Amino acid sequence: INSMLALRDALSSGYDEALILGTDNSVNEGSGENFFMIKDNKLITPELITVLDGITRKTIISLAKDHDIETIERKIDLNEVYECDEAFFTGTAAEVTPIIEIDKTKINNGIPGKVTKMLQNDYFNLIRGKHDKHNEWLTHLNKT
């Protein structure tokens, strides 16, 4: 219910989504998504202590590894997010959604970043069966 209330509050304040924070001002997740940021070509995401261990989250971490992008799971202070190079949400419904602004602070000059777009493209290709790796993650259905 906290997620629903946070989203309702965000929407009524003119935002598209909520960023759920811990009592220590650490970033946990969106109202229904996992949170990632890119800083110095490293993929950073909150540790699993406070967030859902999402399938899409695991997929993005694997895809980043395919590109030799280091993934760091740790506590993220909200102030760090304002200084990040890129940010995005992941989830079953969100898939890979770039974040271009948080609290009126533009991320990457208000445009999706190159790493975000690369991982988003890889993810879309993967779920459509057009990716070179991880074919074992898919169940192909026969046309009837």
Give names to the regions the model predicted:
Residues 1-144:
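Helix-start/capping segments and mature chain N-termini
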